[in-house]
Amino acid sequence: MTVKPDWLRVKAPQWQRVGSVKDILRDLQLNTVCEEASCPNIGECFQAGTATFLIMGPACTRACPYCDIDFEKKPQPLDSTEPERLAIAVKRLNLKHVVITAVNRDDLPDGGASQFVSCIEAIRKISPGTTIEVLIPDLCGNWQALAALLEAAPEVLNHNMETVPRLYKRVRPQADYDQSLELFNQAKRILPKVYTKSGIMVGLGETDAEVRQVMEDLRRVDCDILTIGQYLQPSQKHLGVKEFVTPEQFDVWRIYGESIGFLQVVSSPLTRSSYHAEQVQALMTRFPR
């Protein structure tokens, strides 16, 4: 792997706080994308008492070459106790904002939308003051499943575009760029008040013009929030890094994104889709719906 520049170094966390979060997760037998996807910000987020919960099992039905989550063609059946365990964790961690994401479950007719709904309802029951963000897969373009999910009224609907159209066959071979864009179109049609959010990785060989094009495409479907971060190769068997993008370039994209109408652009080398996601609460106060 290419040698990482200094700006990608992360501070060592206070392991006592990290350990307490891990203890709760282990006690309740919950997965986090922080751990499963080897996120570089795990120390900072766990230290702050936050986590992005990964539902529907630790294994995915897709094998995207950039991702560190395990692949299984036929994952385990859904666990009906998972929503309640997740809600208990939210309460025990005293989370004001929670992010729930999932592996792709192409083996399920609704892509797992009903499990998202169950998790949202369980959290609302025992922690009604917590705002909820769902980071969802593309549901294979099943807009009825999307509508069912949005009936549960999460405050934020997040779906990552991940990369530019030219690189989709290499980076997201089982996904479709236009279908992912249409998800945002459908979401705003179904639930106009929902805050929509997306994220892309850079450093995979994309150009500045291509990144800007994705940003413009997202604004055309009324996406509200964007995250941009550096792709980091999880292991030698994953896609290699083509370039380490400078912090200055991330600032350029942030400024451009704000200029074309995003309510918020979080753009830096270590930004990940749910990094500092709790900041959306301030955004919701500034731009109420």
From Swiss-Prot:
Metal-binding among keywords:
yes
Does the keyword Cytoplasm feature in the UniProt annotation?
yes
Q: Which InterPro entries match?
A: Aldolase_TIM (IPR013785), Elp3/MiaA/NifB-like_rSAM (IPR006638), Lipoyl_synth (IPR003698), rSAM (IPR007197)
Q: Which GO terms describe its cellular component?
A: cytoplasm
- Say which enzyme class the record assigns: transferase
Domain Radical SAM core: residue ranges: 46-263
Its catalytic activity? [[Fe-S] cluster scaffold protein carrying a second [4Fe-4S](2+) cluster] + N(6)-octanoyl-L-lysyl-[protein] + 2 oxidized [2Fe-2S]-[ferredoxin] + 2 S-adenosyl-L-methionine + 4 H(+) = [[Fe-S] cluster scaffold protein] + N(6)-[(R)-dihydrolipoyl]-L-lysyl-[protein] + 4 Fe(3+) + 2 hydrogen sulfide + 2 5'-deoxyadenosine + 2 L-methionine + 2 reduced [2Fe-2S]-[ferredoxin]
The cofactor remark states: Binds 2 [4Fe-4S] clusters per subunit. One cluster is coordinated with 3 cysteines and an exchangeable S-adenosyl-L-methionine.
What pathway is it annotated to? Protein modification; protein lipoylation via endogenous pathway; protein N(6)-(lipoyl)lysine from octanoyl-[acyl-carrier-protein]: step 2/2
Which UniProt keyword terms apply here?
Answer: 4Fe-4S, Cytoplasm, Iron, Iron-sulfur, Metal-binding, S-adenosyl-L-methionine, Transferase
* Ligand binding ([4Fe-4S] cluster 2): 60, 64, 67
Q: Which cellular compartments is it found in?
A: Cytoplasm
Q: What is its EC number?
A: 2.8.1.8
Q: Which Pfam families match?
A: Radical_SAM
Q: GO terms for molecular function, please?
A: 4 iron, 4 sulfur cluster binding; lipoate synthase activity; metal ion binding; transferase activity
At which positions is [4Fe-4S] cluster 1 bound? 34, 39, 45, 274
What this protein needs as a cofactor is:
[4Fe-4S] cluster
Q: Which family does it belong to?
A: Belongs to the radical SAM superfamily. Lipoyl synthase family.
Stated name of the protein: Lipoyl synthase 1
Natural source organism: Synechocystis sp. (strain ATCC 27184 / PCC 6803 / Kazusa)
